[in-house]
Amino acid sequence: MNPNHPHISRVDGGFPDDFLDSLGHGTAVMAAIQEKAPDAEYFAVRVFDRELRTNIDALIAAIQWSIDRQMDIVNLSLGTSKHAEKFEPLVSRVIVVSAAGMFPGDLPGVIRVAPDPDIARDRYRVEGETFFASGYPRSMPGVSRERNLSGVSFAVANMTGFVARACENLTDRSYQSVFEKLRSE
């Protein structure tokens, strides 16, 4: 994550100490979240290095790092088709926002998100247990929407911003309370 990017208002900490994003993915994800919930605290936890690939141990360590520091929300703008059993003991201890159709997004107690190309970036909708949000990040001057990054990563990021905003006025920040608040808005 690049803390000097003009779309990033601040970063309150991170892991590892050098959490600089060489790909731009984490920066675009955080910018989308911060746009919707500018007053939340933000910590960058890097799981990608020089490519959009990681391993299950890095993901589990990142979630555990967040839990150990009593974070309220973990954005996982990624997913895997395996390892549900490794995510299960963690997702009940923090609000996780992740991609539908993958793990941990398809586990009970996770805010699962799918992209909707027709929804505005300042809106979301819910069908059953799945939230739908725009798959586009914040606009970049001089870059058309079609040439910018897009996809489920940014739908998850946009929804994470809505989750963070919903948590601002909740004393009970359990999955169920947050889910119900999001459904009612």
Give residue spans per PLM region.
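Secondary-structure boundary/capping positions in well-ordered alpha/beta enzyme cores
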Residues: 39-40, 111, 173
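C-terminal subdomain of the subtilisin-like protease fold in secreted/lumenal serine endopeptidases
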Residues: 72-75, 168-185
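Active-site catalytic pocket residues across diverse enzymes, especially alpha/beta-hydrolases
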Residues: 36-37, 166-170
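Mature extracellular/periplasmic domains of secretome proteins
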Residues: 54-75, 84-95, 101-114, 119-132
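Extracellular S/T/G-rich loop segment that most often corresponds to the catalytic His/Ser-adjacent loop
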Residues: 100-168
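Active-site core segment of subtilase-fold serine proteases
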Residues: 1-36, 40, 117-124, 140-143
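Generic structural signal for well-ordered, non-membrane alpha-helical segments
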Residues: 22, 26, 152-155, 159, ...
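Subtilisin-like peptidase catalytic core
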Residues: 15-81, 160
